[in-house]
Design a protein with these regions (language model features):
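A residue-level marker of the well-folded mature domains of exported/periplasmic proteins
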Residues: 2-8, 18, 23-279
Length: 279
């Protein structure tokens, strides 16, 4: 099946599901992360394609993003409140920071707004009666990543979190730790300030400093494709390309190129287009 055919299949199935559920005329707000984060462009492509079906059935879709990750939790809560105030009948949103998002989503649900969860926050769904969750099991994905790097000979894995406190990112690195341990290796977590998110130079310097401070680190796993680019640069600057194994969550052209030429060990994809389309 080609990707084009697959998209048609998904579109047909989604349309049928909407018609059966009676939800096809809803006004929906989709809330995602920073406008500076390229990951959300892939999610938005899925949202845009699904919007065509929603609009064809009399509904609307409003796409909202935070400006950055500096004040992430409060910004997300504000966007949830904004969506409710604007009359959204449904909100599709990841729940990265439950302490900020869950109360706002509970209030939205109590007001009759349907909640769809995607990308992060599967464990929080029951708190606001979310209809469904579209995304990966972050813990199992992390375990798989930790096991794979260890199976390739890594003994000490650095797991880099670019947005500390985000549930999905913390869960991924916990999985990496446990997966590495199961396979005879160890992993530790490097949390950097959220204002370094999307900062290639700052992130590369932070990774490089860790590698210099601890020469026993022989693998790095990042939780975003852009961060893997930053790590690749740090590793290259130290003359350790191929010596320090590199892995990441999410795909990009540069990630695939490094895997192809043997300078990156692995990547774990979470299908951002489908997350946006289905949510």
């Amino acid at each position: 099946m080609t990707f084009k055919t697959f998209k048609k299949f998904i579109a047909t199935a989604a349309t049928a599901a909407l018609m059966v559920s009676g939800a096809y005329a809803q006004d929906v707000t989709v809330i995602v992360g920073s406008a500076q984060d390229g990951f959300w462009n892939m999610v938005k492509k899925g949202v845009d394609d699904a919007t065509l079906m929603v609009e064809a059935n009399g509904g609307t879709v409003n796409f909202l993003q935070t400006q950055n990750y500096d004040n992430f939790g409060p910004d997300l809560a504000s966007l949830i409140e904004q969506a409710v105030a604007q009359g959204a009948e449904g909100i599709a949103i990841p729940n990265w920071l439950p302490e900020s998002e869950t109360p706002a989503l509970q209030a939205a649900s109590d007001a009759g707004v349907k909640i769809m969860s995607f990308n992060a926050g599967q464990s929080e769904m029951a708190n606001y009666d979310a209809l469904n969750y579209f995304g990966s099991d972050e813990y199992l994905a992390g375990v798989a990543g930790g096991k794979y790097l260890a199976s390739q000979g890594a003994k000490k894995i650095l797991c880099h979190i670019q947005n500390p406190g985000a549930v999905n990112l913390e869960t991924r690195c916990k999985g990496v730790e446990d997966g590495a341990k199961e396979t005879g290796a160890e992993a530790y977590i490097l949390r950097v300030p959220a204002n370094l998110d999307q900062d290639m130079v700052g992130t590369s310097e932070a990774i490089k400093s860790e590698l210099i401070a601890d020469p026993s680190i022989d693998a790095v796993i990042n939780l975003a494709a852009w961060a893997a680019d930053a790590s690749a640069s740090a590793i290259d600057q130290l003359g350790k390309t191929g010596e320090i194994k590199l892995g990441t969550f999410d795909m990009s052209a540069s990630v695939l190129e490094r895997i192809s030429n043997g300078t990156q060990a692995m990547a774990i994809d979470q299908q951002p287009y489908l997350q946006g389309f289905l949510a």
